[in-house]
């Protein structure tokens, strides 16, 4: 019996305060995409939106990892409510689709996606 294709939403709520953890989640997201060959989306929520900041010390490394995720076909989304609550704007960030995080998670759950939160 063939396994069903299972889409995965990875939610990153850890920001620059835990660089090693955020880095590990980005690497794990890439491995899920390459291994599963099914849709994978990375949602940056809460402090996790800081990974997208283009003007911080670790920006070059995050930019490289995000580019690798995009090349592998991972959709990258950022919670616009989190951006606003942290006083950040989209022009301070690397490219990502702006979504309402709670709505995105609820939608993906209704669609049967696995949701992994870090």
Question: At which residue positions do the language-model features occur?
Answer:
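Histidine-anchored nucleotide/phosphate-binding helix
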Residues: 21-35
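Small/aliphatic-rich secondary-structure junction motif
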Residues: 34-39, 45-51
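Short, glycine-rich nucleotide/cofactor-binding loops
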Residues: 6-23, 49-56
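C-terminal structural segments of small proteins and small subunits
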Residues: 85-111, 116-118
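Short internal beta-strands
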Residues: 29, 40-46, 76-80
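Anion (oxyanion) recognition and catalysis
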Residues: 33-34, 70, 109-110
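Basic/polar N-terminal segments that are highly enriched at the extreme N-terminus
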Residues: 1-4
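A glycine-rich helix N-cap at a beta->alpha junction
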Residues: 58-85
């Amino acid at each position: 019996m063939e396994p069903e294709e299972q889409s995965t939403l990875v939610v990153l709520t850890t920001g620059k305060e835990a660089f090693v953890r955020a880095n590990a989640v980005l690497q794990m997201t890439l491995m899920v995409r390459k291994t599963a060959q099914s849709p994978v989306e990375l949602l940056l929520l809460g402090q996790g939106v800081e990974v997208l900041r283009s003007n911080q010390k670790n920006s070059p490394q995050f930019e490289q990892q995000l580019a690798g995720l995009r090349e592998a076909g991972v959709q990258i989304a950022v919670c616009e409510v989190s951006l606003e609550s942290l006083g950040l704007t989209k022009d301070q960030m690397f490219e990502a689709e702006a979504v309402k995080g709670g709505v995105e998670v609820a939608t993906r759950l209704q669609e049967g996606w696995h949701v992994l939160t870090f």
